Amino acid sequence: MNKKILQILEYDKVKEQFMNALTTAQGQKELSDLVPLTDKDKIQLLFDEVADFRLLTQENGLLNLGKTNDLTEILRRLELEASLSGKEFVEIKKVIQLGINIQRFFDEAENVETPSLNITLEKLVDLSGLIKKLEIFDNAGSLYDNASLELMHIRSSIKSHQSEIRKIMQEMLTKNLASLSENVITIRNDRQVLPVKAENKNKIAGVVHDMSASGQTLYIEPNAVVSLNNKLNQKRIEERQEITRIYRELAEELKPYSFDIRQNAWLIGHIDFVRAKYLYLAANKASLPALTNDKDIILFAARHPLIDAKMVVANDIKFDRTLNTIVITGPNTGGKTITLKTVGLLTILAQSGLPILADDGSRIHLFDDIFADIGDEQSIEQSLSTFSSHMTNIVQILAQADENSLVLFDELGAGTDPKEGAALAIAILENLRKRNVKTMASTHYPELKAYGVKTQQVINASMEFNIDKMQPTYHLQLGVPGRSNALEISRRLGLPETIISEAGQQISGSEHDVNQMIEKLEEKTREVIESSRNIKKIERENQSLHKDLTKVYNQINRERDFELEKAQKEAQEVVKKASLEAQEILKNLNDKAALKPHEIIAARKELEGLAPTIDFSKNKVLKKAKAQRGLKQGAEVNVTSYGQRGKLIRLEKDGRWTVQMGSITTRLSEEEFEVIETPEQIQAKTKNVSKKVTSKVKAQLDLRGMRYEEAELELDNYIDQALLANLIQITIVHGIGTGVIREMVQKKLQKHRHIKSYEYAPINAGGSGATIAILK
């Protein structure tokens, strides 16, 4: 879409309204880079994300996001093995922690599905293992004492030396107070000193580190603490060295994950942007319009987003597929220009995936481009007149617009002779109409009213004017051409009636009749609009009530199901416990030969009859699993609880099997017996064992952090498993690093006879940090 239309319609100013709701640098960057799209599927996904986030928030509250800064430069330096500061490590930590928090929020969310947002969430890499490594920093970027044992010992020594020095210095301060210019211990050259009067310098033996500007005070380090200060400085050097070592090791550990950290940062930014869209939608009563390719622009209660919400006037604009052109006629200052800009701006915002200030049910056609000639764009440098400037712009628009463009003209044909201007305006509109270019134009030429009446696919419109208040209402009236109110306004302003009467006589009868007809149309239109608004109000109230009732109904059902499931589990647990105890008793009795086998079985069946029954016999998943285990009618089994063989008779509704052991029949759970495999089953299982082993092979192998030999062996094994699993495509993540692992991977792939082709992954999927291979 051309940049000029974005400037004319002040697209960037509207984007700024989303900025305050963003908390991440990545989200702000995504907003800054945002431009209108033409791909319907991409735009619809952006709308679906906002809709899903709205449902998520309604059920689980608003997702809280912390502030993060841009990691681009930090990660670049990390990859170049440049040193990072403590604050930079903290910035990395913030992004990683925020990713973990977002994932946890969605995992714990209840009563809602978010399929569109899951597309983003699935790309989030779990970096929770890195958080522990970064917890050695406080929020200011300083290392905690326990960052390492060595650092803890060094800082303990520093504190001990400082305490000893402070004690000695305090004693000397008290003892030599008369010789000092100030009752204070100060610092010079990173060492504690006393401010000694120049005339008393020989009274305190020590090292002079500085002198006051007047020369009256010498800053002396007493000899009593020189040795201790030397030790203290040595410990501080050791502290800096240890901190440098910790930073270096931490950077080496983070480097293999730089791509994942960068990707998470942008994914977090995207979630942040979705959140900002939702907040805008909720705060401004905005909506997500339906997207069409049928040239419908239908806006209910459309408002311009840059006009104060208390001042803006909402308009219904029906510019559907049956219309090609809308001609807005009438006097200036009535809101024609704002109406044109509103249509253009809301269309651009919708094509950017942003909520628009219009009611639900609005529809937006997706245009390839939008062109506008709005306002006074006279070029002073080119010394063009207003008319010439507009006409130059119009010529360019006519050359570039096609049937999938939207064209907006403000005061078309103005700036020249009225008759010629009107003729040009009609000719331009007719040219665009014949080319099937959707066009909205404003004009004050009355000749265009007739064009709007007699031409197919063209409709007149006007901006309502309140005669009683003598001011425009800024309401758009579709189907009603504009009319002049000059005589009536003049009468109300006190112009003599004789002059008004004489002016009226100059107007032809037909023109007078037309004005009366327009006045009646305006009254009828107002009635229809008012009736339509009342209907929509009732519809909104009904929708809101239906939504609330549905929410309550679903909540009641969820609570009911939860309580039923809870009660069922508790009952089963109680019975299971009692059954186990009973089995133990029966087993003991059986061991003592106190009861006969059939008496034991009868007793146990009676006990098990206490358990609540659940019909598992129709569960397809369980049936499939049982079939895979060989559990079917007639199968031979070994009953472990009795140490006897038996045969499966049938599967009961409670999930247990009726098993026959000789002349005895009983019900047993699957845990109480094992299937005895036939030779044929053993042979079939042997043939398929490799297939089962490889059925869980993932389509991605991560070699980051491995040594060369380890990575080489892992790659060989993985390719074998992928071939056995019949995978078509695999991804090997090797990172960027020094390139050694990457070269090894590509050499292996090049030589392997089962690799058809390979290439680096796309930029958004790892770039040169990952290789995608196609298997033969």
Curated annotation (Swiss-Prot):
Pfam families: MSSS, MutS_V, Smr. Keywords: ATP-binding, DNA-binding, Endonuclease, Hydrolase, Nuclease, Nucleotide-binding, RNA-binding, rRNA-binding. It comes from the Bacteria. ATP binds at residues 330-337. One of its GO terms (molecular function) is mismatched DNA binding. Transmembrane segments: none annotated. GO terms for biological process: mismatch repair; negative regulation of DNA recombination; rescue of stalled ribosome. InterPro entries: DNA_mismatch_repair_MutS_C (IPR000432), DNA_mismatch_repair_MutS_core (IPR007696), DNA_mismatch_repair_MutS_sf (IPR036187), MSSS (IPR046893), MutS (IPR045076), MutS2 (IPR005747), P-loop_NTPase (IPR027417), Smr_dom (IPR002625). Residues 701-776 form the Smr domain. Belongs to the DNA mismatch repair MutS family. MutS2 subfamily. HAMAP family: MutS2. NCBIfam families: mutS2. This is Endonuclease MutS2. It comes from Lactococcus lactis subsp. cremoris (strain SK11). The gene is mutS2.
